[in-house]
Regions:
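FAD-binding core/adjacent interface of flavoenzyme oxidoreductases
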Residues: 33-47, 115-207, 296-297, 308
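Low-acidity, Ser/Thr- and Arg-rich intrinsically disordered low-complexity segments
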Residues: 2-8, 12, 18-26
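Short glycine-rich anion-binding loops that position phosphate/pyrophosphate groups of nucleotides
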Residues: 153-156, 219, 313-315
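FAD-site-proximal beta/loop scaffold in flavoenzymes
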Residues: 166-196, 289, 300-372
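Beta1-alpha1 glycine-rich phosphate/pyrophosphate-binding loop at the start
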Residues: 40-119, 123-124, 206, 213-257, ...
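A Rossmann-like FAD-binding core segment of flavoenzymes
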Residues: 113-131, 223-340, 346, 388
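Rossmann-like dinucleotide-binding core of oxidoreductases
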Residues: 200-257, 261-264, 275-277, 364-398, ...
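C-terminal, flexible cofactor-proximal segment of oxidoreductases
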Residues: 47, 378-503
């Protein structure tokens, strides 16, 4: 090695060492972005890490609202799609395909360079280590965060009778909708083959439990499917003879709406041949039917092959987990009682939005999730920007929900809508429902095909998505049995400790 080359190496080392001493001595300590006072971040500080749990309305809209912020967003969800849940009943009744209401989350966020999508079921959120743990097919992923937005949604509630789920699927996932489509169409096919009148009547009886918006829409579409689309397609049976029953323990249809709107929906359903039974609680469900208890305590049985459960919701178990690690409480539905800024009490960098949050009696509807997700994203973006510019962290304003009204379809050309004190029924409400819902369908192609399918279904009698497979109908129960077998095998292979034998 030449002397000049060795000297240059020594000089370079000295200069580098002095520069590092100057940098480390002048760098100010960076407190949390969610503290008070002025924040001075180093020029080359790592971007703020935001983890979003859930790809529903709250999670997706929160992620998209951060697209122009200097943050790194990781969206963790158990599915690879964004689900437009209010239109699930149209997948179940053959109006829309699953792709039209459930686009790929990765494709939706493809052009958002600061967003990454991870598939996994979130099992833990640790405020101490600031990590989110998720599991996908046995692979455990731990994702660090500076802020987290929890929008894991809610599942179906059977009010402590989870065994009902085997016989009466809910309406919360694509799998639910596809299974219900299979059960509905298979019931008509089986009725065509039945020779016993009682068995045929059972196969042609459809019971929807829950007279909220989902139940009303589902009952109305099963009625129209049987009376319009399937009329004349069978030779032994007449699908128009199908019996559709709508049950609810409440005293009115559409409890969240004004009484006059609920009464309008009830009359319209009855004009379609739907039997509406109120003040009726379901006490038992099995393969062949269900038992109903009336308000006077008497019980009667309805023989029905196809049952749909839309009577209640229960928040994600992540709500109870967060409450156990903070000062938060949960309500009877498992929702977290959040602060006015949608954070978990004691955890100012953990936001909870959508169906998982409980605040001021807000309903579990899409608009609450969308506005909550955008609000949480805006708070994070404002505080990150203030920290980057060395300004005081802005005071958080409380979340304010802007009620844009509630809508529910009853049948084609008929819906109910309530916007503040204004109540609208019939064809005008139905047009409003169409416009609002197509606006929130993600992607131009999906909007276009949705409108086309609506035109074919509502103006004509065609439903283009009535194809069913054996897998759609049987997969959920088969997987459930497989899990039970795996659990039983694991229990057999678990060694017994001496103290257990002694006990």
């Amino acid at each position: 090695m030449s002397e000049s080359y060795a000297s240059s190496l020594v000089l370079r080392f000295v200069l580098t060492f002095r520069a590092s001493r100057v940098w480390s001595g002048s760098q100010a300590e960076t407190p949390s972005l969610f503290g008070h006072g002025k924040v001075c971040a180093p020029v080359n500080a790592a971007p703020h890490r935001v983890v979003v749990v859930g790809s529903g309305f709250g999670g997706l809209f929160a992620t998209k609202a951060l697209r122009r912020s200097d943050v790194e967003v990781t969206l963790v969800a158990r599915t690879a799609h964004h689900l437009f849940q209010p239109l699930l009943y149209q997948v179940a009744t053959g109006i829309l395909s699953e792709g039209e209401i459930a686009p790929s989350t990765r494709i939706v966020l493809r052009d958002q360079r600061n967003a990454n999508v991870l598939i996994g079921d979130v099992t833990d959120i640790d405020p101490d280590t600031r990590t989110v743990t998720s599991v996908h097919r046995g692979r455990v992923t731990v994702t660090p965060y500076d802020s987290v937005i929890v929008a894991a949604g809610a599942g179906q509630s059977y009010f402590g009778n989870d065994r009902f789920a085997e016989f009466a699927p809910g309406m919360k996932t694509l799998d639910d909708a596809l299974e219900l489509r299979g059960r509905i169409m298979n019931a008509f096919d089986a009725a065509e083959l039945a020779t016993d009148p009682a068995e045929r009547a059972r196969l042609l009886t459809f019971v929807v439990v829950g007279a909220g918006p989902t139940g009303v829409e589902m009952a109305g579409q099963i009625a129209e499917l049987s009376k319009r689309t399937l009329a004349g397609t069978f030779r032994t049976i007449d699908p128009r003879d199908a019996r559709i029953v709508l049950l609810d323990a409440a005293p009115k249809v559409l409890p969240p709406f004004a009484d006059s709107l609920g009464e309008h929906a009830r009359r319209r359903l009855e004009s379609l041949g739907v039997e509406v039974t109120l003040n009726a609680a379901v006490t038992d469900v099995d393969t062949d039917g269900l038992v109903v208890r009336a308000a006077d305590g008497t019980e009667h049985r309805i023989e029905a092959a196809t049952k749909v459960w839309s009577a209640g919701v229960s928040a994600s178990p992540l709500g109870a987990m967060l409450a156990s690690k903070s000062d938060a409480e949960i309500d009877r539905a498992g929702r977290v009682l959040v602060n006015p800024d949608l954070t978990v009490p004691g955890l100012p960098n953990v936001f909870v939005v959508g169906d998982m949050m409980a605040l001021d009696g807000l309903p579990g509807v899409a608009q609450v999730a969308i506005q909550g997700g955008r609000y949480a994203a805006r708070v994070i973006a404002d505080e990150v920007k203030a920290a980057a510019e060395g300004r005081p962290v802005p005071e958080r304003r409380p979340f304010r929900y802007r009620d844009k009204g509630s809508m529910a379809t009853v049948s084609r050309f008929s819906a109910v809508a309530q916007v503040g004190p204004v109540k609208i029924t019939g064809f005008l409400a139905w047009l409003m429902w169409l416009v609002v819902h197509v606006a929130y369908v993600v992607g131009f192609k999906s909007r276009l095909t949705t409108v086309c399918n609506w035109a074919w279904t509502f103006l004509g009698r065609t439903r283009t998505q009535l194809t069913v497979t054996h897998q759609q109908t049987e997969a959920r129960l088969a997987l459930g049995r497989l899990v039970s077998l795996e659990d039983a095998r694991a229990a057999r292979e678990t060694p017994v400790r001496p103290e257990q034998l002694a006990g």
